[in-house]
Amino acid sequence: MRFSIYRYDPEHDAQPRMQTYELDIEPAGNMLLDALLRIKDEQDSSLTLRRSCREGVCGSDGMNINGSNGLACITPLTGLKQPIAVRPLPGLPVIRDLVVDMTPLNQQYKSVEPWLNNADPAPEIERLQSPAQRAQLDGLVECIQCGCCSSACPSFWWNPDKFVGPAGLLAAYRYIADSRDQNTDARLDNLQDPYRLFRCHGIMNCVSVCPKGLNPTAAIGKIKTLLVKRST
């Protein structure tokens, strides 16, 4: 199989390049990450990428695969058009090769305060929810912060320091929707400006690339609805 892989070391390279590799590997039963690790182990130890769990859980191996963001560890080689083009997630600074600087994503994630705010005295056991209340969080808590969604979003490319992005806004709604949280008004205040939320234009790139099948666009729409209702 043939692979065309993005190579760039900012400390030594004047500009990025695509490097071609050929690997004798059976597509059936193998994921893209399997091939990349074999290339690194057998052909070019300088190839740099992130990986950890290899099960689509940690989110560390997000990359752009034949023009679409995804996780290398759960992307089957079967069906990928050759040469398989592998690039870093777009819109983020490249540290080296397929490794990007996640700081812009992490800063926006932190800005929505992704933790429960509850002023009541802490109970001796966990704060309880009914099954119906917990069901409100389905499709929200499964996010693994891989960055595939925000790095597929043109609005996030345009100004990552102002627009929170799909990943951060999904997290924001996850806590707005949580019955145990008491900070809804402050959370909405935090998003009520022309950029942080309303730069989302609903093109749904985030939905099409999410490896967990989540819908950040729907969550963003619900936040917009809450803000509109609050202002009327």
Regions found by a protein language model. Name each.
Residues M1-Y21:
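Eukaryote-biased recognition of intrinsically disordered, low-complexity regulatory segments
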Residues Q19-N30:
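Short, contiguous acidic and Ser/Thr-rich linear segments
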Residues D24, I65-G67:
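Short strand-turn-strand beta-turns centered on an Asx-Gly dipeptide
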Residues N30-E42, R87-T232:
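Ferredoxin-type iron-sulfur electron-transfer modules in oxidoreductases and energy-metabolism complexes
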Residues D44-R50:
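Active-site phosphate-binding and catalytic loops of NTP-dependent enzymes
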Residues C53-G62:
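Short, structured protein-protein interaction patches enriched in aromatics and acidic/basic residues
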